[in-house]
């Protein structure tokens, strides 16, 4: 996942930044490179340490959905195509994924999607206006399954409060993971977080909503009997 988080000692002194992603840039295919060259001027957003004018960016006022870490972008493009009444922004640190997403969006005729290739924490802090998001999506983040790496997980108390600032009142933070231990970690962090309310009728997970497409990876997991956990928490104050 494309994020960094500050680490402080017990006295509150800054120590270092912890990265929650491993940079696996890989090589761009010719198609991805072509998509970046041709479509970035239309759908790409360059990082700048100032708030975006979201109405100007999309040329209209509409609910904004932000996804962190969209991978190759197939699901994000499908969601944007299926919800033309909403504006979508995707953040992904790996340029091959950004190129793939742009190409897929063009093929699908999607015009309500913009992408940013930068660290998500910095984008949230500097570019996303407070109270501007209808939904923030975090699907299948790196689980960092070894105990000594749990501190690298993106869903941490400070980060979910950063997200809360960016959500409108009534806006939702939607998470999904295929690691049960990480799902339990998410539930623990979110249940303790100020200003959020779990939308689950059972106080834990929600069924996969229709708007979140099944990924190929997820379909394979279902066939093998693997679980997937969705959590949706609403900002209430």
Swiss-Prot record:
Role: Catalyzes the formation of N(7)-methylguanine at position 46 (m7G46) in tRNA.
Listed EC numbers: 2.1.1.33
Keyword Methyltransferase listed: yes
Pathway: tRNA modification; N(7)-methylguanine-tRNA biosynthesis
Naturally occurring in which organism (per UniProt): Aeromonas hydrophila subsp. hydrophila (strain ATCC 7966 / DSM 30187 / BCRC 13018 / CCUG 14551 / JCM 1027 / KCTC 2358 / NCIMB 9240 / NCTC 8049)
PANTHER family, alphabetized: 3-DEOXY-D-MANNO-OCTULOSONIC-ACID TRANSFERASE/TRNA GUANINE-N 7 - -METHYLTRANSFERASE, PENTACOTRIPEPTIDE-REPEAT REGION OF PRORP DOMAIN-CONTAINING PROTEIN
Lineage: Bacteria, Pseudomonadati, Pseudomonadota, Gammaproteobacteria, Aeromonadales
Positions of the catalytic residues: 142
Alphabetical list of PROSITE patterns matching this protein: SAM_MT_TRMB
Reaction catalysis annotation: guanosine(46) in tRNA + S-adenosyl-L-methionine = N(7)-methylguanosine(46) in tRNA + S-adenosyl-L-homocysteine
Residue stretches in coiled coil: none
Sites where the protein binds substrate: 146, 178, 215-218
Family that this chain belongs to: Belongs to the class I-like SAM-binding methyltransferase superfamily. TrmB family.
Any single Gene Ontology cellular-component annotation: tRNA methyltransferase complex
Keywords (A to Z) from UniProt: Methyltransferase, S-adenosyl-L-methionine, Transferase, tRNA processing
Name assigned to this protein: tRNA (guanine-N(7)-)-methyltransferase
Pfam families: Methyltransf_4
Binding site for S-adenosyl-L-methionine: 67, 92, 119, 142
InterPro entries to which the protein is assigned, alphabetical: SAM-dependent_MTases_sf (IPR029063), tRNA_(Gua-N-7)_MeTrfase_Trmb (IPR003358), tRNA_methyltr_TrmB_bact (IPR055361)
Statement: the UniProt record of this protein carries the keyword Chloroplast: no
Enzyme class label: transferase
Gene Ontology terms, MF aspect: tRNA (guanine(46)-N7)-methyltransferase activity
Record-linked HAMAP family: tRNA_methyltr_TrmB (MF_01057)
């Amino acid at each position: 996942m494309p994020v960094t988080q500050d680490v402080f000692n017990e006295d509150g002194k800054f120590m270092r930044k912890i990265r929650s992603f491993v940079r696996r840039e890989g090589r761009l295919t010719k198609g991805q490179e072509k998509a970046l060259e041709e479509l970035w001027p239309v759908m790409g957003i360059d990082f700048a340490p100032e708030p975006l004018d979201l109405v100007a960016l999309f040329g209209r006022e509409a609910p904004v959905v932000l996804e962190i870490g969209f991978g190759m972008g197939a699901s994000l493009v499908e969601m944007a195509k299926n919800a033309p009444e909403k504006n979508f922004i995707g953040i992904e640190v790996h340029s091959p994924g950004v190129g793939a997403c742009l190409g897929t969006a063009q093929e699908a005729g999607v015009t309500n999607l913009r992408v940013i290739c930068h660290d998500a924490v910095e984008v949230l802090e500097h570019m996303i206006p407070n109270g501007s998001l209808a939904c923030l999506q975090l699907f299948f983040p790196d689980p960092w399954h070894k105990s000594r790496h749990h501190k690298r997980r993106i869903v941490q108390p400070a980060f979910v409060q950063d997200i809360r600032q960016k959500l409108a009142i009534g806006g939702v933070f939607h998470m999904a993971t295929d690691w049960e231990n990480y799902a339990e970690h998410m539930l623990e962090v979110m249940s303790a977080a100020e200003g959020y309310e779990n939308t689950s009728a059972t106080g834990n997970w929600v069924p996969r909503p229709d708007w979140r497409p099944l990924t190929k990876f997820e379909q394979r997991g279902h066939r093998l009997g693997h679980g997937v956990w969705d959590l949706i928490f609403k900002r209430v104050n």
